[in-house]
């Protein structure tokens, strides 16, 4: 490209379903009609079942609620993660793993009742486990690994 040229991107015609659009970041965004349920899930059902099991059994073992958030975290990722934690049932006894793939951010926040039970050392290990899988392109595997590592490191109350 020479100085002053305008960069253009070739836009191949995509056969997108009704209500779908290609965003500037290259992702496909889709909506459904009001009152209809979406049948297009971002992850295979079996992956969601395994994640649900990790959350359920991890929460039971640690006697603390584990939760996962995937989405944008804004400019202050830690503050946004704390806001999301406040909306989790029993936020004082909860651990939230918040991941923003577009920002390449991973945050772990937890309530006051979990503090001092091992989460301080388990959280960095969970983030490391997640990041290793994320680098390989495995979002769900990273979430599952992080939840398992962190829940194993938190002692029951």
UniProtKB/Swiss-Prot annotation:
Q: Where are the transmembrane segments?
A: none
Could you tell me at which residue positions the Isoglutamyl lysine isopeptide (Lys-Gln) (interchain with Q-Cter in protein Pup) crosslink is annotated in this chain? Answer: 115
Q: Which UniProt keywords apply?
A: Isopeptide bond, Ubl conjugation
Protein name, UniProt field: Uncharacterized protein MSMEG_4692/MSMEI_4575
């Amino acid at each position: 490209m020479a100085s002053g040229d305008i960069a253009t991107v070739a836009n191949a015609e995509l056969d997108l379903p009704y209500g779908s659009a290609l965003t500037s970041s290259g992702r496909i965004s889709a909506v459904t009609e009001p009152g209809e349920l979406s049948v297009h899930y971002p992850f295979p059902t079996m992956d969601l079942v395994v994640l649900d099991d990790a959350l359920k059994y991890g929460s039971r073992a640690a006697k603390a609620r584990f939760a996962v958030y995937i989405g944008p975290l804004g400019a202050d990722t830690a503050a946004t993660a704390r806001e999301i934690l406040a909306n989790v049932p029993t936020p004082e006894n909860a651990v939230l793993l918040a991941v923003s793939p577009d920002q390449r951010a991973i945050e772990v926040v937890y309530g006051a009742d979990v503090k001092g039970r091992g989460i301080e050392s388990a959280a960095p290990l969970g983030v490391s486990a997640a990041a290793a899988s994320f680098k390989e392109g495995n979002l769900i595997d990273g979430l599952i690994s992080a939840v398992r590592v962190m829940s194993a490191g938190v002692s029951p109350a």
